[in-house]
């Protein structure tokens, strides 16, 4: 989990994903379309991906992908991100984290 903590503090928005996951693709597209430029870690393509996936599950991100962190805090998965978007909270959250300069 220390590895995740270090990784999510390096960028305003971090997405843990799998290259074959359609929900991960949807969330990456949404955040990129806003201009957030997230750091994306494809767990099926990096050496410690399995270990990170297990740590995400222990943190409460279920399913583990997509796992979205904004401002160093776990937001959750696709359902949580889409709920924030629909209720108008996502863009202000991205601005507070320094991911958007609008």
From Swiss-Prot:
Protein location: Cytoplasm
Domain Glutaredoxin positions: 1-101
Keywords: 2Fe-2S, Cytoplasm, Iron, Iron-sulfur, Metal-binding, Redox-active center
Keyword Flavoprotein annotated: no
Disulfide partners: none
Gene3D superfamilies in the cross-refs: Glutaredoxin
Gene Ontology MF, one: metal ion binding
Record-linked InterPro entries: GlrX-like_pln_2, Glutaredoxin, Glutaredoxin_subgr, Thioredoxin-like_sf
Record PROSITE patterns: GLUTAREDOXIN_2
Annotated Gene Ontology cellular component terms: cytoplasm
Top-level taxon of origin: Eukaryota
BP GO terms, sorted: negative regulation of transcription by RNA polymerase II
Keyword Cytoplasm: yes
Residues annotated for [2Fe-2S] cluster binding in this entry: 21
CDD domains: GRX_GRXh_1_2_like (cd03419)
PANTHER family found in the cross-reference section: GLUTAREDOXIN
Stated family: Belongs to the glutaredoxin family. CC-type subfamily.
Function: May only reduce GSH-thiol disulfides, but not protein disulfides.
Protein name: Monothiol glutaredoxin-S2
């Amino acid at each position: 989990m220390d590895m995740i903590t270090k990784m999510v503090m390096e960028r305003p928005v971090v997405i843990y994903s799998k290259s074959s996951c359609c929900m991960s693709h949807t969330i990456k597209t949404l955040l990129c379309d806003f201009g957030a430029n997230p750091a994306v870690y494809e767990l099926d393509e990096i050496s410690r991906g399995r270990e990170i996936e297990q740590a995400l599950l222990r943190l409460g991100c279920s399913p583990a992908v997509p796992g979205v962190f904004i401002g160093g805090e776990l937001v959750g998965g696709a359902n949580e991100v889409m709920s924030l978007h629909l209720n108008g909270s996502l863009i202000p959250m991205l601005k507070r984290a320094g991911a958007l300069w609008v």
